């Protein structure tokens, strides 16, 4: 259903006004709202950061987070996060459209986006080709990333130049910026996206995902999946430690997009006190998905990588724990009620 700009803006304001750091930006002709992103929680260390934005224009209002890269029209956001407002929103759209019914033109089939692939990563070098004393090698060693996984990771000192080679015009100035580059392949082994992880602590965006075309895959690791359960984690680096591990990039949690429906097991970060994590776990449990719980874990770190590098866990120990702590349906609801601390 096509949207109506003034209705989009009204419901965006109503849906977002309660969020922390909400403000309306009045320095341009475009209707803009700024807020802390409810999808990723924005920054855990800086409560003043607000990287969620709503942009209203003459076509359709959209929400975008510059931290987790979540992007959706306001109608989709309402449907996912504000179902009561969504029903009212649909009613208002239908009521407004019912006032005048233009003569319907024959519907044209929507053009399918051209499925481009990323044939090369200019200005990058693969980690397994670098010398042991290179700074990025020291970085991945410090994170305990296995050496046999280095071939899946790349490094660049010219991130803006790399991005502009795939998405021209993204950066006006191609200044030097080092990032760990993580290519994202489709099931056929063709790269469609890549994620850049900031190496500077003060970088405004820790993770940035770049797509070759609008519908490009943002599911990491699918080209390496074998038989058996598939573990869906929150970050590409965590997935490198897990057999048959894949990862969600871009901050979205769309069950229709994630593959391996009959085999997947969701492994969210160990954050029983984080409202967004518990909200997403609840959504998965209510949808009948298989979910892995950290409630009996001997490790207290937030994610798999920290459990290994900070607490001395091995990938084998974590895999064994995960296999024995999967729940679904009523059992999952019971585990979640005990696990959640909010």
Swiss-Prot record:
Record SUPFAM superfamilies: DNA primase core
Source species: Enterobacteria phage T4 (Bacteriophage T4)
Keyword Transferase: yes
Keywords: DNA replication, Early protein, Metal-binding, Transferase, Viral DNA replication, Zinc
Enzyme class: transferase
InterPro entries: PRIMASE_T4 (IPR046392)
Assembly behavior: Monomer. Hexamer. Interacts with the DnaB-like replicative helicase; this interaction forms the active primosome complex, which is composed of 6 helicase and 1 primase subunits and expresses full helicase and primase activities. Interacts (via C-terminus) with the single-stranded DNA-binding protein. Part of the replicase complex that includes the DNA polymerase, the polymerase clamp, the clamp loader complex, the single-stranded DNA binding protein, the primase, the DnaB-like replicative helicase and the helicase assembly factor.
Annotated family: Belongs to the Tequatrovirus DNA primase family.
EC code(s) of this entry: 2.7.7.-
Binding site for Zn(2+): 37, 40, 65, 68
Function: Synthesizes short RNA primers for the lagging strand DNA replication. The primase synthesizes short RNA primers on the lagging strand that the polymerase elongates using dNTPs. Recognizes two trinucleotide sequences 5'-GTT-3' and 5'-GCT-3' in vitro, but uses only the first as the priming site in vivo.
Domain of life the protein comes from: Viruses
Protein name, UniProt field: DNA primase
GO MF annotations in UniProt: DNA-directed RNA polymerase activity; metal ion binding
Lineage: Viruses, Duplodnaviria, Heunggongvirae, Uroviricota, Caudoviricetes
GO-annotated biological processes: DNA replication; viral DNA genome replication
Keyword Disulfide bond annotated: no
């Amino acid at each position: 259903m096509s949207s109506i700009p003034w209705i989009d803006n009204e419901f965006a304001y109503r849906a977002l006004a309660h969020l922390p750091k909400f403000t309306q930006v009045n320095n341009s002709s475009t209707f803009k709202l700024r807020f802390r992103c409810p999808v990723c929680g924005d920054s855990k260390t800086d409560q003043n950061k607000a990287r969620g934005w709503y942009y209203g224009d003459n076509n359709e209002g959209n929400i975008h987070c510059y931290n987790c890269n979540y992007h959706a029209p306001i109608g989709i956001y309402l449907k996912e996060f504000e179902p009561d407002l969504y029903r009212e929103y649909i009613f208002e759209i239908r009521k407004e459209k019912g006032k005048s019914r233009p003569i319907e033109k024959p519907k044209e089939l929507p053009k399918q986006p051209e499925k481009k692939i990323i044939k090369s990563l200019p200005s990058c070098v693969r980690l397994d080709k670098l010398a042991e004393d290179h700074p990025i090698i020291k970085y991945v060693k410090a994170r305990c990333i296995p050496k046999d996984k280095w071939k899946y990771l790349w490094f660049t000192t010219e991130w803006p130049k790399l991005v502009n080679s795939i998405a021209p015009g993204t950066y006006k100035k191609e200044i030097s910026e080092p990032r760990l580059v993580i290519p994202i392949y489709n099931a056929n082994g063709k790269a469609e996206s890549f994620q850049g992880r900031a190496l500077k602590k003060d970088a405004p965006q820790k993770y940035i995902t770049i797509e070759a075309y609008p519908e490009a895959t943002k599911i990491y690791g699918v080209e390496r999946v074998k038989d058996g359960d598939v573990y869906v984690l929150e970050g590409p680096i965590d997935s490198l430690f897990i057999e048959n591990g894949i990862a969600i990039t871009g901050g979205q949690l769309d069950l229709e997009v994630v593959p391996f429906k009959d085999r997947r097991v969701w492994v969210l970060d160990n954050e029983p006190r984080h409202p967004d994590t518990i909200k997403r776990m609840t959504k998965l449990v209510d949808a009948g998905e298989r979910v892995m719980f950290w409630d009996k874990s001997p490790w207290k770190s937030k994610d798999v990588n920290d459990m290994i590098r900070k607490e001395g866990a091995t990938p084998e120990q974590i895999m064994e724990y995960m296999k024995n702590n999967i729940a679904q349906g009523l059992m999952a609801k019971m585990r979640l009620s005990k696990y959640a601390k909010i």
